[in-house]
Each structure stands twice: as C-alpha cells, then as structure tokens.
C-alpha cells in the first residue's frame, strides 16, 4: 500500500509541475520503473540471505533431509511401499 500511495503522490506532483502530457507520462514511467527496481533489489537481498542460510553447514542433516520431503506427495504411496516390503 505504501508504494501505491507513493506512486499516486508522485503522480500528483508530476501533474502539478508538468508542462505537457508527455512530461507527465515520462515522469510516471520513470517513477514506476524506479519503484520496480527497488522492489526487485529488496527481493534479491531476501533471496540471497535465504541461500546463505541453506548453505550453512549444520548438524542433524538427516533430520533436515526428512523435513524437506514433501509428505503430501509421498504420503499416498506409503501403504503401497509397506505392502510390497512385507511380501518378500
């Protein structure tokens, strides 16, 4: 919501000080591009920090490996695997 209000405020300022429609259009385009680039930089910083956390050497690797399994996808196959293992 803050970015929306910032864009609207900057648009109002552009309309106030602009000399023509083209100036207003160019100003809005520049402000929107600037906001998009700032958001992308913030997201890339968050992604970089997540990558660093995942690459850290931590104990309990086996436990983390089990946690990372998507049980909703694997769950329906568990009874079949148990049945096959019991047959010999």
Swiss-Prot record:
It comes from the Eukaryota. GO terms for cellular component: extracellular region. Coiled coil: none annotated. It is found in: Secreted; Target cell membrane. The modification Alanine amide is found at residue 85. Expressed in entodermal epithelium along the body column. Residues 19-57 form a propeptide. Residues 1-18 form the signal peptide. Keywords: Amidation, Antibiotic, Antimicrobial, Immunity, Innate immunity, Membrane, Secreted, Signal, Target cell membrane, Target membrane. Disulfide bonds: none annotated. The keyword Transport does not apply. Belongs to the arminin family. Antimicrobial peptide with a broad-spectrum antimicrobial activity. Keeps its antibacterial activity under a wide range of salt concentrations that mimic physiological conditions of human blood, which is surprising, since Hydra is an obligate freshwater animal with nearly no salt tolerance. Does not affect red blood cells. This is Arminin 7965.
